[in-house]
Every structure is written in C-alpha cells, then in structure tokens.
Design a protein with these regions (language model features):
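Contiguous beta-strand/loop segments that form the cofactor/metal-binding neighborhood of enzyme cores
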Residues: 174, 181-301, 345-351, 374-376
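Beta-loop-alpha module in the N-terminal Rossmann-like domain of NAD(P)-dependent dehydrogenases
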Residues: 18, 47-107, 340-343
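Rossmann-fold dehydrogenase core element
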Residues: 103-120, 140-145
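C-terminal helix-rich "cap/oligomerization" subdomain common to oxidoreductases
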Residues: 1-3, 8, 64-66, 288-380
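Predominantly a Rossmann-like dinucleotide-binding segment in NAD(P)-dependent oxidoreductases
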Residues: 121-203, 209-213, 220
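Hydrophobic residues in well-ordered beta-strands that form the structural core
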Residues: 90-91, 115-117, 223, 249
Length: 380
C-alpha cells in the first residue's frame, strides 16, 4: 500500500485539525506545512516547515497539497500546485469570484491533476442517507429547504480576515457554500433564481445574511446565517419538506434529527437505514383524521386521499402509515467532523489510483455552490 505524502498550506486551527485526523490514516503521512505566521518552531511536530508556500508546492516528495488559507488565496495556490504536479484538496469555498473558480477548472483540465473542494459535510452519514433517499424518490420530491445557522463571533475580532470581504468573500461565500452544496446534493436540482439580503453591524462587519434560491424542479430554499452571538447560542437547523416527509436535522455538522413521514412497508424499510433510527410513533392512516381545518368546516379528507392513494401536489402515493422517529450519530461532533475530513482525503486518493472513480464532491459541484453564493452576495 502506497503512503501518500501530504503538505498543508495554512497551519491555523483547522490546518492543525486536519493534521490531527489525517495522521491517524495508515495510507497518509503529513510531511510538510507552510505557514506565514510567527510560531515557535517547537509548535510543529512535523518533518518540514516552510514559510513560503511556493517552497511546499515545489517539494518533490509531496503528492497531495491541502490548502487551508483565506479564500482569496485559493485560486492562485491551487493552480500553482496543480502546475507543479500536485493533487489538491482545497478548503471551501473554491474561490471568491467566478473568474478565479473558472481558472481553477481550466488549470485542472490542462494538467489532469486531481482536485476537489473540502465540502466534507457530504461525507456525513446522515446527509449521505438523505441524499440516497432523494435519489430513490422514496419520500417524493424535496420541495423546501430552510437553513437557520446561528454562529458565534467571539473568536472573530473586528479585524479578523473573516469580516474582510475582499479576503473571505463574505459570509455567504465563506460559510454559506456548505449549505448551498448540501441542498444541491439532497435535491439533485439546479438553481434558476437567487436573491440575497444582509445586515451590517458596522462598517467592518456584515454579520447577518440571508438568501432565497429557486431551483429548476420546484425546490425553494431559504438560508439564514448570523455570526452575531456567544457560543452558548450557536445552533444550526436544516429543515427539509418532502412530499411524504418533514425532516429536521440539527447541527452544522449534522449529528441528530427527527422525521415524520407517510410510508408503506418499502419506505419504512428505507427509513430504518438512517443512522440511529428509532420509531417514536406509528399509526395507520385509516385511523387518523385530517384536522388541518377547524370543526364545522366540513370533511377535508376527501380532497386529499382516496381509498388507494394519498395526493401531494397532484401526485398520488401508495402509503398506509404515518411514522415519526428520531435519528442520531453515536460519535461526538469532533469525531464525526474528523471522520469526514478523513473520508474526503481517502476519496481523493481513490480518484488518484482509479481515474474512473467518482468523487462524492467534484470541482464542478463546488463551482455550482459557489455560483449561488456569489449571486446571493451580489444581490444583497
């Protein structure tokens, strides 16, 4: 088994996190870092420490370069690394502008090197299962996505690069791309219309943003991100409305959630494959009355169901039970996060070894999410 040698450009908190989890892999060795910060040399338990990233990408021992820098540097570094014969795992977003992203795509095509972007939430077991459910059509179409993301800003001083939109692209580009990508993966749909709004706390900090995205098969998605409070209030929910189900997922790195769905035996079997699935309620549809309208309004059941089908958006489904349940991963947030970054690096390695292997997140996928982020940022 070949051991792939990895170099990391950018050795802040996330660079260290990647190193911590990648060094646990038998087929990977992190041999070099490049960081422009002033760190005591003893901070680095690593073979090679560069203070100029050009030296790292020209290191002939390195197979894969991981780029973990402010987003405005991504395109230049990724293109240079590929031209130097290195495969690349690029931190999200792929870039901050359409032009830079297109340059990365062009360079990949010219060099033939493997590159993807670290949208590692695609490797989360909960998201993977709901992607599969979406592809199978088990729950009908995904009609609405609502993301509410309340993030802490305690570690983000007013002069942090995160607030500098020339460096980060702004919240929707630096952070929102994760959730645009999740909706793209869950639905398999393409955006057609994008709108954005925002609030500025002051001249330096645009701290609350929102976007609405309309997709080609009817999905409407709403995204809200606020970097404006203490860590105690940090919370992310992802709500999904399918024809046959209502789902609420908790955590920007999804860890648990709940679902209510109308099912038949086949669909119920597919729900059992969701990690940590536990049924909390199960009722025959024939025993449930539709109480969506108040008493005295009249019988509302006849317009929704027949003896054989239940209708959503004019489409009939053969279902006979209403099921509610919960799901939850057994690991901690850090463990789930760590396994996701291990999985994406192993995905890149599989692609290096087998060009026919399909990455779970492609450069084209990352470009699609970035374009939604760019458009929503321009329209705000």
């Amino acid at each position: 088994m070949k051991k792939y040698k990895v170099g990391i450009i950018g050795y802040g908190g996330f660079g260290k996190f990647l190193h911590h989890w990648w060094e646990k892999l038998d087929n990977v060795e992190v041999i070099a870092i490049a960081d422009s910060g002033k760190h005591p040399e003893q901070d680095f338990d690593i073979e090679k420490v560069y203070h100029d990233w050009h030296d790292l990408i020209n290191d002939t021992e390195i197979d894969i370069v991981s780029i973990v820098t402010p987003p405005n540097l991504h395109a230049e570094m990724a293109c240079a690394a590929m031209k130097a014969g290195k495969h690349v795992l690029l931190e999200k977003p792929a870039a901050t502008t359409k032009e830079d992203a297109l340059q990365i795509l062009k360079t990949q095509e010219e060099t033939g090197m493997i590159i993807t972007v670290n949208h590692m939430i695609r490797y989360n077991p909960i998201i993977q299962k709901f992607v599969q459910l979406g592809q199978s059509g088990a729950l009908g179409k995904l009609r609405q996505v609502v993301v509410n993301n309340y993030a802490q800003d305690e570690a983000l001083a007013p002069d942090h690069w995160f607030w500098n939109e020339e460096m980060s692209g702004g919240i929707l580009i630096e952070h929102g791309v994760h959730f645009f990508d999740i909706a793209n993966a869950l639905s398999g749909q393409k955006y057609t219309e994008v709108y954005g709004v925002s609030n500025r706390r002051n001249e330096l900090q645009r701290d609350r943003v929102a976007a609405m995205v309309v997709y080609n098969e009817g999905l409407i998605a709403n995204y809200y991100h606020a970097f404006s409070g203490p860590g105690f209030f940090e919370q992310t929910t992802i709500s999904l409305a399918y024809d046959l189900a209502r789902v609420e997922i908790e955590g920007w790195m999804p860890l648990k959630g709940k679902i209510t769905a109308m099912v038949n035996e086949k669909i119920k079997g597919q729900l059992e494959e969701i990690p940590g699935w536990t049924i909390t309620q199960n009722q025959e549809l024939d025993s449930i009355r539709d109480n969506s309208r108040p008493e005295g309004w009249g019988d509302s059941d006849s317009s929704v169901t027949s003896k054989e089908l239940t209708y959503f958006g004019g489409v009939g489904f053969e279902v006979d039970e209403m099921v509610s349940g919960t799901f939850e991963l057994p690991e901690t947030k850090g463990e789930v996060y760590g396994k996701c970054v291990q999985a994406i690096l192993n995905d890149v390695i599989q692609k290096i070894e087998n060009k026919d292997h399909k990455l779970a997140i492609t450069l084209e996928d990352a470009y699609e999410a970035l374009m939604i982020a760019v458009l929503s940022s321009e329209n705000k």
